[in-house]
Amino acid sequence: RDYRNKDERHGGCFRIAKGPAHNYRWLVAPEAYGAQHPEYYALDDGKRLNYPIRGNEVELCLSNPNVAQVAAENIAGWLRADPDTDMCFIGQSDTPSYCKCDNCEATRKRYGGWDSTRR
C-alpha cells in the first residue's frame, strides 16, 4: 500500500507491504496453504478456520512454528518483489475466533489471556 502523500512534517512518505493492519490474510493466504495445511489456521469449536472469516479476515495458529516460517518467507518475497517498500506491518484480525488448539490454549493459560495467543 502506498502512503506517498504523507506530509513531510511527519517524516515524509513510506510504503507498507500488504497494508497497515489485519494482514494475516496475506501472510499465510488460505488460497495458497488452506487445503494442504489446515493446521496453519485457528482451531475454533473443533474446526480449522482455513478460509476467510468475517469478510476478508483470517486467524492463524500462532503456536505452529511453520506459520512463522511461511509468513517470513512471504514477507521476504514481497520485499524482494518491491524494493521500494519501506516496511511490513504484521497485525492480527479483530475477530473472536482466535486459535483454541491445545498449544495455543496452554500459551493463553500461561500468560493469562486470549490475546497472548496472538503474540
Feature locations, PLM:
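Feature activates predominantly on carbohydrate-active enzymes
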Residues: 1-119
